Amino acid sequence: MAHKFEIYKDKAGEYRVRFKYNSEVMFSTEGYSTKAGAQNAIDSIKKNGPNAPVEDNS
């Protein structure tokens, strides 16, 4: 599987999500106090991400 989401616990004890492609981290999220919060972030990205517009702020 080339693409995957990972939930992990950071040094501060918060749950974070990172999205990886071929072992390279493409992005990571803010910290969540619960694993359920991190899972909700994944669900939201999967639901809303495919149709999200690209905003170029360069």
UniProtKB/Swiss-Prot annotation:
It holds the Pfam family DUF1508. Disulfide bonds: none annotated. It comes from the Bacteria. Gene3D superfamilies: 2.30.29.80. Belongs to the UPF0339 family. This is UPF0339 protein Msl4696. The lineage of its organism: Bacteria, Pseudomonadati, Pseudomonadota, Alphaproteobacteria, Hyphomicrobiales.
